[in-house]
A protein has these predicted regions:
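A short loop-to-beta-strand structural motif that recurs across blades of beta-propeller domains
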Residues: 85-87, 125-127, 183-185, 224-226, ...
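Short, conserved, GDST-rich strand-edge loop motifs in beta-rich repeat architectures
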Residues: 164-179
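Short loop/turn segments immediately following the C-termini of beta-strands
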Residues: 81, 121, 167-169, 220, ...
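Short loop/turn segments immediately following beta-strands, especially the blade-tip
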Residues: 228-235, 318-324
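Blade/loop signatures of beta-propeller domains
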Residues: 30-54, 178, 325-326
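Blade-edge beta-strand/turn elements of extracellular beta-propeller
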Residues: 43-60, 93-101, 133-145, 183-202, ...
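Blade-level signature of beta-propeller repeat domains, shared across WD40, Kelch, NHL, RCC1
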Residues: 296-327
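Beta-rich, blade/repeat-based domains predominating
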Residues: 54, 60-75, 101-120, 124-125, ...
């Protein structure tokens, strides 16, 4: 079995969507098969999970899954980066329905009006889909006259603005990098695009703390998680290291992340989902058979984690309740 990044790049290369020269070195490795399990590092891990909690497969047969978003109609939106589709997945039956063809869709979320936002890498844009998901509007694709790189993940901020990361990992084959850095941006409610951070090596997943005072961003190449103080005007300050996912990168790297109402972080990392306390302690890991890319809270009480991992979607019940910014 290949690592998540290697699987992704093999498929994107085969589709002619990316170039081999653009791939970071950590994307070319193999990993050993693994079984699903919960690995506690601290006893506090069991405050979040029952000892007998099981990870189960919801649906499979995808190309490469990303960007899950729970809808209260009991389905998941799921991006498929290699099949170039966004799907609706019935979580009771596992049935999947194609909604829209879209080149390399990635991280997703809802906005305040419950409209789906997606990072469309081939378009090099953040887009908003129509209510039925069949049409889209571009919200951001240029910064200061230059095209964005390849937007990767997106989150709704406590101020109602949209925040997203813009690495180069999904830059389309033959495309020129016009912006000389990999930024983290804010789309204000009036549509204005603002650069917040430009000194990260490979920004990927991002999330806000439940009190709206912190912005977390992970860096796939550095295998780090950073935290910033979030200000009422939408700016950030005092960036500092929150945690480091120290493991062989061929087992996976930091990617999507979510937060629960107590402030614990659930971050994609080597072998699965790394669970961090709000104080920055790695308290345990959800080991997933396929390497995850992203996750979301779901079900009526938002106590279930839905995880997109390579060709499948998985879920696990928790004793926590998810912090969902758009509710």
């Amino acid at each position: 079995m290949f690592s998540i990044a290697a699987v992704r790049w093999k498929l994107l290369l085969a589709a002619g969507m990316v170039s081999l020269a653009a791939a970071p070195a950590y994307l070319c490795a193999q990993q050993k098969p693994r079984k699903a399990e919960l690995q506690a590092i601290s006893p506090t891990f069991w405050n979040l999970f029952e000892h007998g909690a099981k990870l189960t497969q919801v649906a499979t047969g995808f190309g490469f899954t990303e960007g899950p978003v729970w809808d209260e109609s009991d389905f998941l939106w799921v991006s498929d980066e290699t099949l170039n589709e966004i799907f609706k997945v019935d979580v009771k039956t596992g049935e999947k329905k194609k909604v829209i063809a879209l080149g390399d869709p990635d991280g997703s979320t809802y906005d305040k009006q419950h409209r789906l936002l997606d990072c469309a890498s081939v378009l090099r844009a953040v887009i908003r889909l129509s209510p039925d998901g069949t049409k889209y509007t571009i919200l951001a694709d240029h910064f200061e006259g230059k095209r964005l790189n390849s937007p990767n993940d997106v989150v709704l901020g406590p101020d109602g603005a949209i925040y997203f990361t813009d690495p180069t990992s999904d830059l389309p084959k033959g495309a020129k990098q016009e912006i000389p850095f990999k930024g983290i941006y804010r789309i204000a409610e009036d549509g204005k695009l603002q650069l917040l951070i430009k000194d990260r090596t490979d920004p990927n997943g991002l999330a806000f703390s439940p009190d709206g005072k912190r912005l977390y961003v992970d860096d796939s190449t550095e295998q780090t998680i950073w935290v910033y103080d979030f200000k009422p005007d939408g700016s950030v300050a005092n960036g500092r290291l929150f945690g480091k996912e120290t493991a062989d990168p061929k087992e996976g790297v930091p990617d999507g992340m979510k937060v629960d109402k107590q402030g614990n972080l659930y971050v994609v990392g080597p072998r699965g989902i790394w669970v961090w306390s709000a104080a920055g302690e790695h308290i345990g890991t959800i080991v997933v058979p396929e390497q995850p890319a992203n996750l979301t809270w779901g079900d009526s009480d938002y106590a279930t984690l839905y995880i997109t991992a390579e060709t499948s979607v998985y879920r696990i019940s928790t004793k926590a309740h998810g912090f969902v910014p758009y509710l």
